[in-house]
Amino acid sequence: MKTASKNTGPTLFMAPRPLRAWYQARRVCVELEGGRILRFPITGNPRLESASPAQLGRIRLMPSGLHWPDVDEHLSIEGILRGDYGQHA
């Protein structure tokens, strides 16, 4: 006899926290909890594209993402995992 599973509503997705982040060769690299490393290009994000390498290297880790205070840009880890790297021109 099969029993119906109970639908308790939408499942919450908790993106892993960033442990460290750096800028290298026109890409942002992020090491996440669990050891995964993400790399994504700065192209397509006007704020990051117009920033100097020094500004791009000043990344603040936030519980849910990355912040570049010099260029007032914030990207969430959840968005990065979806392929959303910020504002598009």
Please annotate each region the language model reported.
Residues 1-89:
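Motif-centric detector for short Cys/His coordination patterns
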